[in-house]
Amino acid sequence: MSTRELVVLGTASQAPTRTRNHNGYVLRWDDEVILFDPGEGSQRQLLYSSVTATDLTRICVTHFHGDHCLGLPGTIQRLSLDRVPHPVAVHFPAGGADYFTRLRYASSFHETAELAVMPIDTDGQQIAVRNGTLEARRLRHPIETYGYRLVEPDGCRMLPERLSAHGIAGPAVGELLRVGHLDVNGRRVTRAEVSAPRPGQRFAFVMDTGLCDAVYALAEHADLLVIESTFLASETALAAEVGHLTAAQAARVATESGVRRLVLTHFSQRYPDLSRFAAEAREHFTGDLVIAEELMTVGIPPRRVPSAG
C-alpha cells in the first residue's frame, strides 16, 4: 500500500538547540522519498527515523544558508557508503551551484552513488516525478531561494450506483476508465456519466521567505503545508527585515489558501516554549494544526471527496 507522509528530522532555524536539530524533512510520496533541506546532523537524524539513505530518491534544497544545507556532505557520502543502487536527483537554486559543488566534495570519499544534478534556474520550473509534478517558485529572501510544491494529477472515482444503473460491471469498468466511453445496449456511456472528480493531493514546502505572491501560489489548496514560522508576531518587523515569517502570518496564508493541514517549523532559538506558536497560529487558522517536533511523522490527509452531484 502506498504511503504519503512527512517525517521531521529537525525544526531549528539558524542555530540548533539541545532539543531541536537543524532543519531536515523527508516526504514519502509513494515510491518517491524526497529529502528537503538537510541541515547539520540530518544523517544522524535519519538513523533515528524510519527512513534510510537507500530510501532516498530525490533531494530538494531551498537555498544555501547553512541550516538548510550543511547536512548535504554527510548525506551525499552516506549514499555512496550504502551503495544506493538508483540515481538520486538533486534540485537547488542554480545560482548556488558553486556552494553545492563545495558541499558535495567537502572531503575525500569514494563516490559510487549516482546523483542526477538538476538545478532550478526558472521561477515556476516544473519537474515530472512519480505520481505528480514538482514545481519550484522563487521566494523573497536575501539570497536565491525556492519553495517547492508537489501536485498529483486530478483523477476520477467510479460511482458503483451509476455503473450498476447502466449494467456495467467487471472488466467493462476498466475499459470504460481506460478508453473514456463504452457502448452498452446500443447507447454510448461516457466516463463522466458514471464517475465523480477526484482532486489530486497537494503538498507544499515553504521555507525562508517574507510574504510574497509565491508563498500563496505554493500553498494554494495544499493538503499539507510545511511552512517556516521563525518568529512570533511580536517580531513582525524583524521578520520582514530578514526575510522570514511569523506564526500568525503562516497561519493566515494557510487560511487564505484553503490549506487542510498546517505544519509550522523552523523556530528561532529565542523561543524555548513552542506552545506560543500554536496559540498564535490558532487565532488565524481553524484547520488541522501541527507544531513540528523532531522525528515526528505527519500524514497527508486523504484525498478530498467532492459531492458526486
UniProtKB/Swiss-Prot annotation:
Keyword Kinase recorded: no
Cofactor(s) in the UniProt record: Zn(2+)
Keywords for the protein's UniProt record, in alphabetical order: Endonuclease, Hydrolase, Metal-binding, Nuclease, tRNA processing, Zinc
Binding-site positions, Zn(2+) 2: 67-68, 208, 266
Top-level lineage group: Bacteria
Pfam families found in the cross-reference section: Lactamase_B, Lactamase_B_2
Residues engaged in binding Zn(2+) 1: 63, 65, 141, 208
InterPro entries, sorted: Metallo-B-lactamas, RibonucZ/Hydroxyglut_hydro, RNase_Z/BN
EC number: 3.1.26.11
Active site: 67 (proton acceptor)
Catalytic activity of the protein: Endonucleolytic cleavage of RNA, removing extra 3' nucleotides from tRNA precursor, generating 3' termini of tRNAs. A 3'-hydroxy group is left at the tRNA terminus and a 5'-phosphoryl group is left at the trailer molecule
Listed GO MF terms: 3'-tRNA processing endoribonuclease activity; zinc ion binding
Cofactor note: Binds 2 Zn(2+) ions.
N-terminal signal peptide: none
Gene3D superfamilies: Ribonuclease Z/Hydroxyacylglutathione hydrolase-like (3.60.15.10)
Task of the protein: Zinc phosphodiesterase, which displays some tRNA 3'-processing endonuclease activity. Probably involved in tRNA maturation, by removing a 3'-trailer from precursor tRNA.
Binding partners and assembly: Homodimer.
PANTHER family reported for this sequence: ZINC PHOSPHODIESTERASE ELAC PROTEIN 1
Family: Belongs to the RNase Z family.
Protein name: Ribonuclease Z
Organism per entry: Salinispora arenicola (strain CNS-205)
